[in-house]
A protein has these predicted regions:
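Conserved, mostly hydrophobic/aromatic
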Residues: 22, 26, 49, 79, ...
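Active-site mouth loops of central-metabolism enzymes
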Residues: 1-13, 61-70, 149-160, 211-214, ...
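N-terminal beta1-alpha1-beta2 module of alpha/beta enzyme domains
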Residues: 1-53, 57, 148-153
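Hydrophobic faces of well-ordered beta-strands that scaffold small-molecule active sites
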Residues: 30-32, 57-62, 87-91, 155-158, ...
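Alpha-helix-loop-beta-strand connector modules within alpha/beta enzyme cores
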Residues: 40-60, 120, 199, 322-338
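Short, acidic/polar
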Residues: 8-21, 75, 158-167, 289-300
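Glycine-rich, proline-tolerant flexible connector loops at the mouths of alpha/beta enzymes
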Residues: 29-49, 179-183, 311-323
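An alpha-helical appendage that flanks or caps ligand/catalytic pockets
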Residues: 103-151, 180-301, 331-353
Length: 353
């Protein structure tokens, strides 16, 4: 970690191969992150790769404010049709690249964007919207009708601030968390669930976490040590700080938990935090044997977590390890199918006729 490898750049060929590997191995959803600095622009990338996929859902991250809501609704509906209902959306509420914006502006814009999407995807005839940020919008609903029904693509959302939790509780479908001790995760879930009840809603919960799994715990820990063997703190900090969310409350909280870990970086038995020293965002990994990792994932499921966004280093190889050692022993379904979003037959919309 903390080193650059030209063979693993986030270019089209490498990211395409990772995604198609996950599709072939039976994963049902994959995150396409958004960043101005690294990686592929997620909506463009998803549109290009959609015809190559067979079964996997695409969890497309988008930062609210980058698209005008009517065209965003139409772009996502078009992508949902390309994927035949295999689109999910991760709403991001960070500052726009190059700007410093007040939290009040961001949350107002974010809430109105989500509100418009849900309105556009549920109205039979017209979209009549009124907001403080975007003003009045009046449009026919047909051009933005998605492939999925009963509310359109699932909306994922994360964040630890009270405003983040409130936005998710009011509008979204899945509250996505980063790794924390179990008691902290459970407290967050209780808080968000209580907030959702005020709006007569219930939510699903997801966990974004890295994984290092090998045939034995000793091999997994050895790989974790190898990952840090060439770590340079200055390079790691530079890589971490170039990202849009490097100074967010969530990233700072991940850093705080790492300070509480033991000398080898473990916060809990197999929850390893050193991986967060060289990257922003999700800052911990499950490191262990298949039995250990499976046991911990089942503990999370017993808490009420039903969606997992997993990753590792290198991405393609860790995807293969997990698919061979752990995935066959987990319940593996599409959350959008569980929630009745994908129709049994293609819907009749302007994008299908």
């Amino acid at each position: 970690l903390g080193q650059t490898d030209p063979d693993r750049r986030s270019n089209w060929a490498h990211t395409r191969d990772i995604l198609l590997t996950a599709d072939r191995l039976g994963y049902h959803n994959i995150l396409l992150p958004t960043s101005f600095v690294v990686g592929q622009e997620p909506i463009a990338f998803a549109s290009a790769i959609a015809p190559m996929t067979k079964n996997i859902n695409l969890l497309v991250a988008l930062r609210t404010g980058e698209y005008h809501p009517p065209m965003l609704a139409r772009a996502l509906s078009t992508l949902d049709h390309l994927l035949e209902g295999r689109l999910t959306v991760n709403i991001i509420n960070s500052e726009l690249p190059g700007y410093k914006e007040s939290p009040e502006l961001r949350y107002q814009r974010c809430g109105e964007t989500i509100d418009f999407l849900k309105l556009a995807w549920s109205q039979p005839d017209r979209i009549e919207f009124e907001g403080e940020h975007y003003g009045r919008i009046s449009l026919p609903a047909d051009p933005a009708k998605p492939y999925q029904q009963n509310g359109g693509p699932l909306l994922y959302f994360g964040g630890i601030s009270p405003d983040s939790k409130e936005v998710c509780a009011k509008y979204c479908d899945v509250f996505l968390m980063w790794p924390e001790p179990e008691e902290s995760l459970y407290a967050t879930m209780q808080d968000v669930s209580t907030r959702a009840l005020k709006y007569g809603r219930t939510l699903d919960f997801g966990l974004r976490i890295h994984v290092v799994v090998r045939e034995t715990a000793e091999e997994a820990r050895a790989w974790a040590r190898r990952m840090m063997s060439r770590f340079d703190a200055d390079k790691g900090a530079a890589l971490k700080n170039r990202t849009q969310d490097a100074q967010s409350l969530g990233v700072k909280r991940q850093d705080e938990f790492r300070e509480s870990a033991n000398d080898e970086g473990y916060l809990e038995e197999i929850l390893w935090t050193d991986i967060g020293r060289a990257r922003s965002g999700c800052g911990a990994a499950l490191v262990g044997s298949p039995e250990q990792v499976l046991r911990q994932l089942r503990r999370y499921m017993d808490m009420g977590i039903r969606a997992f966004v997993l990753s590792g280093y290198p991405l393609k190889e860790e995807c293969e390890h997990f698919a061979r050692l752990v995935l066959p022993h987990l319940p593996n379904v599409r959350l959008s199918d569980v929630q009745g979003r994908r129709p049994a037959v293609p819907p009749v919309t302007p994008l299908t006729t």
